[in-house]
């Protein structure tokens, strides 16, 4: 009996680990795609990604989906490039929490700025589709790394 149980337990653990890694890769790819959509001001794709109840926290304030899309579309903030140095992904049930250490090159109020941020992204999987629930920019005290 022990001979049968141990391989079965090992198989179940490896399947669970594979599934977890697959989900993490899926969310990581989606996060990277989101940065590109933001740089391209692709509000149509972002509109599909952002949940209707999503919230966004920036250095200058916080707001919901409609205002975030309007800020991107109108150029209030142009996310030119996010240089991502590391991503930590935690999956809790149907929720993915990502911590991204980035340098962000953006145009804000007509001025190009570069800031180091820890960006927290929260995604929720509903009916097999990942939707962004929150995006928070926390400014880091470290120097900018991007050259």
Which residues are covered by each model-predicted region?
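Sec-dependent N-terminal signal peptides
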Residues: 4-15
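A beta-strand edge to alpha-helix "cap/lid" segment located at domain peripheries
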Residues: 7, 20-48, 53-147
